[in-house]
Amino acid sequence: METTIIKCEIADHIARVTIDNPPVNAMSPQFRQEMMLVFDRISDMDDVRVAVLTGQGKVFCAGADIKSRVGRVAQPGDHWHNSRTSRESFHCIMECKKPVICALNGPALGAGLAVAASCDILIASEKGSLGLPEINVGLLGGGRHAMRLFGHSLTRRMMFTGYRVPASELYRLGIIEAVTAPEDLMD
């Protein structure tokens, strides 16, 4: 199966994985399937020593693709299937046999935060941020993944207010290893 949303280029023992689902790299069912396929393949590649995950455009990943759910008639089991494939799309990164570096090129929101939190090392451009905006659409989610990175107080602030933690604060808190100019992120 070829992938169209999760792109992977390999050079010099580095797998550069790019989320390319315009306009905001939202997580659709196809996104989740391709993420699992790409990271499972990377785990089996002897010539790959590290993977770097980033997003195409101005957003790393804006979270769940709500638009893909509009107009769909729910069938029995849909909720559980969606939850399971979402979890697996995070676990394939956490369980990858190669270290995975997240290069936050822009905001990682909701499920996008979970993707970033699943990586082994995080770096960000000055435009990177992490947030849980679900409260703005009447939902509450993502806290489990945020708690792997943040303390209870900041996680609650993010969940209850939609606060986005900017790259400078992520660095100050020790969540990310470096902040770069946007044009230097992938160097």
Segment roles from a protein language model:
Residues M1-Q56, H91:
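Conserved CoA-thioester-binding segment of acyl-CoA-metabolizing enzymes
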Residues E2, C92-D187:
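Crotonase-fold acyl-CoA enzyme core
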Residues I5, A26, P76-R87, K127, ...:
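Residues at secondary-structure transition points
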Residues V17, L53, D65, V115-A117, ...:
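Hydrophobic/aromatic residues within transmembrane alpha-helices
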Residues I19-P23, V73, L104, G174:
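Short, histidine-centered active-site or binding-site loop motifs used for metal coordination
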Residues D20, G55-Q56, A62, N105, ...:
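A secondary-structure boundary/capping signal
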Residues E34, D47, G55-C92, A108:
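Glycine- (often His-adjacent) and acidic-residue-rich active-site loop
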